[in-house]
Amino acid sequence: MLDISGCNDAIKSYDSIYNFNRDLIKSIDMTAHGDPVIEYLLPGDPKQGFSLMQLITTSNICAHFVEPDGSAYIDIFSCKTFDILVAQSVVQRHFEPKKMRVNYITRNAG
């Protein structure tokens, strides 16, 4: 889970979010299952912005990008391990946040 703030204007762009999603999936070696759902939600609300949902073969990636305050909340849920530092690098490259808080949970059902 990555909570970021002080982002650039890429969080306001459908195309930028779409390209971020593609780059993230490739960089952390996941496989997309279908196309992402990217919708603009809550117009006029303090939390308005794009939300992203992408199924991956090992679970999903979800995010919400809050336009008014330049923050975003990104969840990468996968039963396949991935390099969180690579994910952080992709987020940094696309959105240039001034702050990033990371919570990484290693899953193990066995």
PLM features: residue spans?
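Polybasic/polar functional segments that serve as interface/processing modules
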Residues: 1-110
